[in-house]
Amino acid sequence: MILVVLIKRGQQFKGGESMINVNEFNYDIVKRAFNHAKTIRTNKKITYYEIVTSFDIETTSAVQKGQKFAFMYIWQFAFENVIVYGRTWEEYQHFISKLVEILQLNEHKRLIVYVHNLGYEFQFMRKYFEWSENGVFAVDTREPIKALTTTGIEYKDSYILAGLNLDHVAKNLQHHKIQKLVGNLDYTQIRTYKTHLTDEELAYCANDVKIVVAYIHEQIEEYGDITKIPLTNTGRVRRYTRQQVYFNGQKQHRKTGGQYEKYRKLMDTLTLSPFEYEQLKRAFQGGFTHANANKQGKVIDNVTSYDFTSSYPTVMVTEQFPMGRGFHPKIKNRKDFNFYRGHYCLVFDIKFTNLFPKIKQEHYLSSSKCKCSNDMVEDNGRIFSASMVETTITNVDFEIIERAYEWDKAEVSNVIAYRKEYLPKNLIKAIIHLYKNKTKLKGVPEKRPEYMRSKGMLNSMYGMSVTNIVHEENNYLNDDWTTSEPNLKKEIVKYNHSKTRFLFYPWGVFVTAYARRNLWTGIISAGNDYCYSDTDSIKIENGEKHLPYIKKYNQVVKNKVKDVCKKYELDIEDFEPFTIKGKQKPIGYWDSEGVYDKFKTLGAKRYLVFQNGKLMLTCAGLSKSKGVDYLLKVSNNNIDKAFQIFNDEMTVPSQYTGKLTHTYIDEPVKALVTDIDGNKVEVNPLSGIHLAPTEFTLSISKIYNQFLLALIHGELLIKDVQK
């Protein structure tokens, strides 16, 4: 609902809305609004008001005598189109207590309040309220995404729901036109509750809660009511997928022809043992991201970039995955091993003796996932050679390792084998539906929100398949964060018997393995022309020379798509949709991103390119836009000089990084500060987060530097260099 309220008192600011000081607020507005508000009772016997509210604060960070502290100087609370603000926590406590009194809230009758990045606000306000036992749900220490007070105020995080910052949330609103205001608050200035705020500054404060209110209204339109909105973005995807696989996407579950029973029967066969789960966790790896050490630090002209069209979704719809319970096959020799790895999905422990590379351009094994001898030679986190390497892998990983290394001896143990089949038909259809929507909606301005939703959900399909079954619990109790170790056996039993589960953890382990294998076909084919790779993309020299490989690979994908379509009687056109401009985008193909005029890499997630007159930077820990701005500034827009400056000694001053250091303050602080108006004010925050701009230094590790020097001086041996 949208409240239409005539407000006679309150401060008007640009845009025509009213922002009411809490000390002038007429609480009759609340009574009138909530008297007509809809309430919803859930199956857990909890009643919620369906009124959209949002809360936000602005803070100041300061340092005195080496002590860091931070404090709030304005809060704003929106319920529908009414925005109330105050300047102190005492005012906010009083405001909330009045809401609780008027609405008769308690732990069984609640009001949901959305906060964009709840973890930040929670650190400032947590000691001002009493929290319900087990009422704070966190994904990590200091990262609550839901927090319930004993008086029935239920804070939820809209950031983890949207997966976007407020600027992008505003841009993707479908029915509301609100822009995130920028540039109106200088966060380096000291402001307190006594600091005068201009109309523009108040507009900035109000705008953030307005965006959240508009966003939540659109979520209600999508899901039906406020209690049905998922807690997280992944929850959104889970709900969509569960509906597709169990009920064919239909709301009338009785009309699904027994689909629920069929899928439930499959899930009952897909169970794990604690030992099996731990072995699978050891075998799991993410995307492969690395640079060819032979190209490191060099400025290379005419580098072609190729990327896969939806890499993870592709393998999910074209490859075969573990089905049924795992078993321990009897493997007596290499012949047995080759049979099982050709006909089953395998996970196993392996020990290599005297491991050496047999290709120059790249090394596959991650040192962080292996136990190695002291003589290991490391290539920026990847194993070049070692006299002993122990690790846990899949049979798909072994395919890559065979092509990248040689060894004197390999000992395999603890082999778990799974019958392999395509993923269930309805799951594949759900993935392809999202891919088709993403492709058709891309580049259509009025459909941007729907495009972003389909794209985000498609990208989350893989992520939810590898969510840890067993993880630490993060608890907030007595003003403190604690973690508790889970009971492995108990959690695995719970997982196996879950009646809502629709995924199998081993599927996710093999999704990334297949994707790495696909990427490595390009790395190996490119040979010495290979420069860099990142999960689903590859940068190579002499791009035209490698077109035969690209075409051959794409044909392999096309054949795999044909096979799965034949198996499940699916329409191949859904796998090859057209964009708005009439370009066909088959899923899984290598697609050219064009040619870089200049390219330079300093290692994983560190590269600079110049293309079509534009400088572009990817550097972990540094804002892309801020980093480019700095390089252009110090190079005086000289591109060649910018590439020279981008090296392992580059330091970006704090004012150019866009990077903030977060320091958590858990103890009360009393300090006398002078604000920008000259007011001397005593502040006494109970807790908070101090934010400070920080510089960025691009440095190469000592171990990697030693490897590069040895490589340059020809001190590293490659056992059998590829022809």
Q: Where do the model's predicted regions map?
A:
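Conserved catalytic palm subdomain of right-hand nucleotidyl-transferase polymerases, strongest
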Residues: F55, K156, K298-Y312, S454-L458
